[in-house]
Amino acid sequence: PRLTASKFSGAEAARVRGVTQLLRAGGCPASVVSDARVSLAFSSCAMMPMVVALEGAGWRFASVRKGDWLTLLAGAAREALTLTAAELGVSSPWFRPLLRRPLFTAISYGANWLAPFDAEVYLEHHFTKVGEQTRLMMQGYLESARARSLPSAHIAELNQRVFGG
């Protein structure tokens, strides 16, 4: 089972409600939000540094918990949220302050327990396949930070360590 609902928005409220009702009736969690684009952008940029750190740690959660990976990825996630909010012209989400080492530590312990499959194996296969997209996203955060004169030291260090760039 999925942990979060798929997010939907649109100009035709009745149509969006109909889609989400059909999905829920079929067992797929779905919800209506004011702007799915913003919601998805925030969830993506909060997750991406965890994926990059996991890759840097050999796709093992136990290895992510060693050294400063968790501190680095938490800082990168907060920076990415700030950058994304600036790009979209909205406020940072309420959960930004929660993106700290303890939260990502809990995620690193809970991911394999919560997923109905081996999360490490899945993440490695999926994100290796879309690795170029991951690198482009990280580069995009760095370019956005430069253009807006916003902090990106954690993103830059994580990117350098894992991708050498």
Enumerate the language-model features and the residues they cover.
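Helix-loop-beta segment of a Rossmann-like dinucleotide-binding subdomain
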Residues: 1-7, 57-65, 118-128
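Short, well-ordered alpha-helical segments in soluble proteins
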Residues: 23-30, 53-56, 84
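Short-chain dehydrogenase/reductase
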Residues: 9, 13, 70-71, 131
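Inter-helical turn/loop segments and adjacent helix faces that build the functional surface
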Residues: 31, 62-67, 145-152
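NAD(P)-dependent Rossmann-like dehydrogenase/reductase catalytic/cofactor-binding core
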Residues: 78-165
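Rossmann-fold dinucleotide-binding core
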Residues: 1-44
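Active-site-proximal catalytic alpha-helix in oxidoreductases
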Residues: 37-81
